[in-house]
């Protein structure tokens, strides 16, 4: 199961610098492409709005063949579904595949993760407050 994590952490820059120093001194390589660290819960909520979460869930569970089909599943306007899908694609959570067929090419959404996790470390938040 492939998991993407949104991590709420106060002072992520300071933590990232500390982690980078540890990695350099230990000779380790650590790049997490499946994690986004943010110090603002408002930003996380804006990035992963309820509409985008619903869209992600529908893609994982229903595996629609097009954005039109996804819009029908969600009962939403296709232009809004496209906008939200483009945001999820820019985050690396989904990809939009061009599928040719009758008429013009369609965009087929494909989930790149099976699960999204929202992580809060209360001790980290309290420590940096």
Indicate residue ranges for each PLM-predicted region.
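Hydrophobic residues on short alpha-helical segments
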Residues: 55-57
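Amphipathic alpha-helical dimerization/coiled-coil segments
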Residues: 18-32, 114-129
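A short acidic, leucine-rich amphipathic alpha-helix
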Residues: 69-72, 88
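Short, cationic-aromatic polyanion-contact patches
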Residues: 45-51, 66, 99-124
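A short, conserved structural fragment
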Residues: 92-99
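Short alpha-helical segments that sit at the start of domains
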Residues: 27-53
């Amino acid at each position: 199961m492939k998991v993407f994590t949104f991590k709420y952490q106060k002072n992520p820059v300071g933590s990232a610098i500390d982690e980078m120093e540890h990695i350099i001194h230990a000779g380790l390589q650590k790049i997490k492409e499946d994690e986004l660290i943010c110090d603002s819960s408002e930003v996380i909520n804006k990035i992963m709005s309820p509409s985008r979460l619903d869209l992600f869930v529908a893609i994982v569970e229903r595996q629609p063949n097009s954005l039109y089909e996804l819009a029908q599943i969600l009962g939403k306007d296709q232009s809004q579904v496209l906008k939200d899908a483009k945001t999820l694609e820019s985050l690396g959570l989904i990809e939009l595949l061009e599928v040719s067929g009758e008429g013009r090419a369609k965009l087929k959404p494909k989930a790149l993760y099976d699960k999204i996790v929202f992580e809060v470390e209360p001790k980290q938040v309290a420590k940096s407050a």
